[in-house]
């Protein structure tokens, strides 16, 4: 668990305390979130889909700050998938503009809160101005000591695995790597998430029971919490419920519960 970052007395007064129902010693180090339901939230309120995406940004800002305050080490969110380009052009253009606007508005505050921002995905396909902002945000916050905030943008899990395989193949062709030495550790080292541990907890909003091509390798042993809450409505209570659910699990990583031994009864 990462120690919450407080900058001066003013910052200390703004930290949201961890709910008493959550064990601070058993927090997940890394939380991943599939932020789903912006469009349905807007449709239910008879609002334009753009309003749903804007409301989703507010939910993300609150969730990020709570995770930072509560000592979560890494937060990785699925912001824009490689498949999202197939959405209507107007919606895609709005999302790109929204990314740019939010980065410009929030970067200074996030830097003051010691958030370290990274963007994971095929960033070369993004608009040039957005790429420039992403580079600025990454460079500005690279030395921060707060939560690691990964924004998966133009990201696809299968694409990430293919690129990792291509990198390994290139190393073999160049004579830098013996194929017999390739193992899980070597493969994971070529992934976009190679600098930190895999997610402990995956949260998916909107009730959908799928992972949607998100972190296919990294989610191998993650605990999964699915909530019917639409992403714009996700709040501190929603996050608390997810953490309580996580702490109720016995993580066995393919093994068995050491407190249970049925063979003694045979």
Swiss-Prot record:
InterPro entries: UPP_synth-like (IPR001441), UPP_synth-like_CS (IPR018520), UPP_synth-like_sf (IPR036424). Binds 2 magnesium ions per subunit. The active site is at 36, 84 (proton acceptor). Its cofactor is Mg(2+). GO terms for biological process: polyprenol biosynthetic process. Mg(2+) binds at residues 36, 223. It comes from the Bacteria. The keyword Repeat does not apply. PROSITE patterns: UPP_SYNTHASE. Substrate binds at residues 37-41, 49, 53, 81-83, 85, 87, 204, 210-212. Its EC number is 2.5.1.-. Disulfide bonds: none annotated. Belongs to the UPP synthase family. Homodimer. Catalyzes the condensation of isopentenyl diphosphate (IPP) with allylic pyrophosphates generating different type of terpenoids. PANTHER family: DEHYDRODOLICHYL DIPHOSPHATE SYNTHASE 2, DEHYDRODOLICHYL DIPHOSPHATE SYNTHASE FAMILY MEMBER. This is Isoprenyl transferase. It comes from Prochlorococcus marinus (strain SARG / CCMP1375 / SS120).
């Amino acid at each position: 668990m990462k120690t919450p970052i407080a900058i001066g007395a003013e910052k200390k007064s703004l930290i949201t305390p961890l709910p008493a129902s959550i064990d601070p010693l058993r927090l997940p180090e890394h939380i991943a979130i599939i932020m789903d339901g912006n469009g349905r939230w807007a449709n239910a309120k008879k609002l334009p889909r753009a309003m749903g995406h804007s409301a989703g940004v507010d939910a993300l800002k609150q969730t990020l700050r709570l995770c930072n305050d509560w000592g979560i080490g890494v937060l990785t969110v699925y912001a824009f998938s490689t498949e999202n380009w197939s959405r209507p052009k107007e919606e895609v253009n709005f999302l790109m503009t929204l990314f740019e606007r939010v980065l410009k508005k929030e970067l200074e505050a996030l830097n003051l809160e010691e958030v370290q921002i990274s963007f994971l995905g095929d960033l070369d396909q993004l608009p040039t101005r957005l790429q420039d902002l992403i580079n600025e945000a990454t460079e500005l916050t690279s030395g921060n000591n707060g939560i690691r905030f990964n924004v998966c943008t133009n990201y696809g899990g299968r694409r990430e695995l293919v690129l990792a395989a291509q990198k390994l193949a290139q190393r073999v062709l160049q004579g830098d790597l013996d194929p017999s030495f390739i193992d899980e550790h070597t493969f994971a080292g070529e992934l976009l998430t190679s600098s930190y541990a895999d997610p402990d907890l995956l949260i998916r909003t909107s009730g959908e029971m799928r992972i949607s091509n998100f972190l296919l390798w990294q989610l191998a042993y993650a605990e999964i919490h699915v909530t019917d809450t639409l992403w714009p409505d996700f709040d501190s209570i929603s996050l608390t419920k997810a953490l309580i659910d996580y702490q109720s699990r016995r993580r066995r990583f393919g093994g068995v519960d050491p407190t249970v031994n049925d063979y003694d009864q045979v």
